[in-house]
Amino acid sequence: GWQGRRGGRYNAIQTNDKFPDMKELSEQVHAMGLKLGIYSSPWIGTYAAHIGSYSDNPDGENQWIKDGNHNENFRYEKPGGNYWQDRKEMYRHGAYSFVEADARQWADWQIDYLKYDWNPNDLYHVKEMHDALRATDRDIVYSISNSAPYADAPLWVEYTDCWRTTGDIRDTWKSISSIGFEQQRWAPFCGPG
């Protein structure tokens, strides 16, 4: 993951040492004629155990970061802890939102695409990020994941640019065929990008 601690001009998620200068990276990628995407979550932690756009602390620093329960790249790591159970505690929305701060930071870095990942997707958090991205001066493609509920398809069209309709793909025929051949009901909600 790219995520480090909160800070900078907006108190947004900053990069860890693996990505020392996201703006420079963006400029290099754009110079090659490509676009640059980023991954985040409206939870306090992502599926990969890095910080997300919410926190239980008003300063945005999650307790596990304050307690030092992370590796050198600020990924959750607690010696002697139950890694999988502890990580599940991150899969929730915290008391404080830093969505606007994160969106402003990504716009400053010239990010082109956001994959916003949590499950189940809900209108409040979808719209919150939509509004934050639209308030920046950058056109950022907004993709939600995963398993966007079909019943809310009209909302996804209104507030996102793209959405994922299934869980992870596996290297089995059942997985490939169910993902590839059982998505017809989504067709009425497709359109040009």
Please give the residue ranges for each predicted region.
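Aromatic-lined carbohydrate-binding/catalytic grooves of carbohydrate-active enzymes
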Residues: 1-123
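Residue-level signal for the start and early helices of compact helical domains
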Residues: 10, 97, 133, 154-156
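Extracellular/periplasmic catalytic domains that process cell-envelope and extracellular macromolecules
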Residues: 29-32, 107-108, 134-137, 155-157
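Generic structural hydrophobic/aromatic packing signal, biased to beta-strands
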Residues: 36, 106, 129, 142-144, ...
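Short secondary-structure boundary/capping segments
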Residues: 53-55, 129-130, 156-163
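Glycan-recognition surfaces
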Residues: 73-79, 90, 124, 141-193
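Extracytoplasmic, non-cytosolic globular domains
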Residues: 110-114, 118-148
